[in-house]
Amino acid sequence: MQHQLVLQFRGSTLEDLDAIVALEERLTIHLAGVAKVDGHDIGSDEANIFIITSDPIGTFGAIRPVLDHANLLTGATVAYRPSSGNDYSVLWPAQSDEVFRVA
C-alpha cells in the first residue's frame, strides 16, 4: 500500500524556495530506490514536502538524520496517510496530539 509522507515546516524554518528545493534534492538522492519525493508547496505560514512510500515509518527513519543534520527537526512536523485516505498519523514530534493538516 502506498502512503503520502509529509514533512511540514512552519514559520521561518524553511520559508525560502531555494532551501525547499535544496532539501528536496538531498532527499531525492538519499531515498533513491526507496521512496519518491513528489514535490512541495509553500503556503502563508508553512512549507510542505511530499514523499510517496510504501513504508512511511521506515522512510522517516531513513531521512531523519538528513533533517537532524540540517537542524530542521525542531521546527518540523512529519505525518503520513494512506494514498487513498484523508486522515494523517503524526510521526514527529513523537507523542504529538496535534491534528495534522496541509493548508
What positions do the PLM features span?
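Short, low-order "capping/linker" segments at domain edges
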Residues: 85-103
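Short glycine-/aliphatic-rich beta-strand segments at the starts of folded cytosolic domains
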Residues: 1-14
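Short acidic, S/G/P-rich loop/turn micro-motifs used as interaction or catalytic elements
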Residues: 12-16, 56-58
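Short amphipathic alpha-helix segments
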Residues: 17-33
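Conserved short beta-strand edge segments in small beta-sheet-based binding/regulatory domains
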Residues: 69-86
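Short, intrinsically disordered low-complexity segments
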Residues: 33-66
